[in-house]
Each structure stands twice: as C-alpha cells, then as structure tokens.
C-alpha cells in the first residue's frame, strides 16, 4: 500500500490518494466539515438523502439507483458523523476498477460524473430541492428519528449527551429535532448546501488499485467552477468539567433498565484514553465484561466509548431492574482498579493487541483505509498502523493509572424499566 502526500485541488480542498494493488475496486470519499446548531442539524441529515437519491440528470426516484446498477453495481452513499461540536458530511462512491469490468468497458469517468452531478447539480428547480423528492427524504428522516425514540438504548445515550453537553452543539441529536425537521423547507436545504459548497473545508480520499491521474483531475475540474471561501473549523471542543456530577432518573416501559455514565477530563493524551477504554470494554478480558457482566451478572451488556474531541468517556449498559445501584458501584470499581493498578498485568497488552488487530483489519478494504485516513485528520490517530502501534506500546501502566485518576464524574442517567418487554 502506498499513500501519497496530500495535495490541494482547490481552495480548502485537500486530496489524499492511496494505491493498493490487492484491491479490485475503487473508492472516492468526500468529507465536508461543517459547524452545527439546532437549525442546521436536521438539514445536514436531510442532505445525506437529498443528494444521493436523485440529481438533475437522474431526477426520477429510482433512476439514479438504476444507473448505478448498470455500472456493475457501483454504489453512492452518504452519512453524517458528529465530530466534537461539528459535523462531517460524508459522501462515498465505490465501483469496480476499469481493468476488471467483464466487457472491458471503463466506468471510472462515468461514476465520477454521477458523483459530481449529485453534489454540484442536484435535483432542484427555482432555488429549491424538488418538492416530491424532499417529501420522501423528510419522511425518511422522521421515521429514523421515531426509530431512535423506540430504541431505548439510543434514546438513553441521546438523553445523556443532552445533559452532559448542555448548551454545546454536541448536545444536539445527530438527526436534529423532530419539530425542526417538520419546519425545514426545500429552499432552506438548498441554500445551506450551496453555502457548504462554498465555505466548508473539503477532504477527499481516493483509494485505488492502481495509479489513475484522471481521478484527481476530474475532481479538480468539477470543483473549479465554485467560488470557494473556506472557513476554518475547530474539531477539538473539550466540554467543561462539572464541579458536582448530575444524576437523572426516570421510568420507562421497558423490561430492562438503561444506564449511561459519563466522565470528562481536562488533559490526558488521546491514545491513553483510547487504550483505557479498550481495557474496560472491547475484548474478552475487558474489565466491564469480565467483572460487571459475567462475574456479578449485573447487566445484559456493558460497553465503553471515548469521545476524544469532547474529552468524554461514556459507559452504557442494560441493567437488570432493581440492580441499578449495584451496577453503578461495580462500574466505578473497575475505574478504581485501573486507578490503583489493581488490574491484571495482561489486560493492557491484550487491549493493545486488540487495537492493533482492528488497525490491520482496516487495511483489508478500501472503505477501511479511507476511514482510517479520515480519522487521522479528525482525531489525530496515525494512519500508519506501525506508528500507531509504537505509540500505544509506549503507554505505561502508570500512564493508565494516572489517566483513570484524572477522569471526573459528570453525568449519570438511569432509565428504570417498569416491566413491559418492549426494550
């Protein structure tokens, strides 16, 4: 695998190309970095659907999908990821390499034309997205929001985030507020998208099996007609630590209780917290799995995640009703074990091996490679697995102990199950 040094395709447009001959397909990943607020959040979510369901050249619902299928099942998709207080609007296209098409027909140029057509010439008239398309996409988003409310795990995580990051953009749900989705208009969505095209920093990652200069040149020419005025975006936005943690208790009709605990920190190296998180959750010997779930039988599941841009550690689990306080105490005991060094000697090494394995697996696919490069840009993780492994192995047991001691309790959310089995 060869990763070329990034180049600039235009003002605020960074292009990174990776060549890996073991791959059979090509992938282009476009990332638009945008600030978010309560009004723009639902529009960002709508754009992921509006810009990939149709275009000016393929306006009919299903026409774009049919065209992609005709190009040997090429794919165009979109997603959004919360990065601190900002949003990463991500569009990705993948297709079979020209050298491997059954009839020898080159398709790279056609796929890139479809991608640029969707982004630069969407299905819109008179300064607004097409009404019929907008109605379908809005209903899709409303259904997604309703689905999250029905998924009590996601609902609990959302409520905990709203509490822990109150007053910060990170408190806004990824899909935005349902009421604001209903108030969004086709014209407002197109206006915001045009603003994003002109002002958002753009990161483009191309993962190809062989060198093809036409990919970068096609993208450069595609964006050349846009008057770019990129605005800087700050990804790292540490959330203020509370002097006194807050606790919220509520009852909901589910068969198991939901528990979310959040800690914040001021100044701990990012990979140290990543490794600490892996020691808590993510391996067969992780503390939460072995002690809280298996040994004490307090929960159905228990996992830990790290939000490095917000300086937050999140632990969530489904708890047997009536044992919520036991679970809170047991989770706290695992962090105390890390703080005092009372954890097994092998635990840290096993966590490092798990992280090294995940990094190696990411290199097996074009999407994994692209995601790792994007993570390097947003989160500061080295895209080179060897360099990242060396950094992880430099972390000492004392580093983990100090990190665990520097975590500051912030939020505890308990949704007490009242017995109806619809969790």
Locations of regions flagged by a protein language model:
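His/Glu-rich zincin catalytic helix
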Residues: 1-71, 103, 177-180, 186, ...
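M16 family metallopeptidases and their MPP-like homologs
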Residues: 16-18, 23-44, 61-117, 153-179, ...
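Acidic/histidine-enriched alpha-helical segments
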Residues: 65, 121-146, 231-241, 333-362
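Compact, aliphatic and Gly/Pro-tolerant "microcore" segments centered on a short helix or tight beta-hairpin
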Residues: 127-195
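Short, low-order "capping/linker" segments at domain edges
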Residues: 142-147, 244-258, 356-367, 373
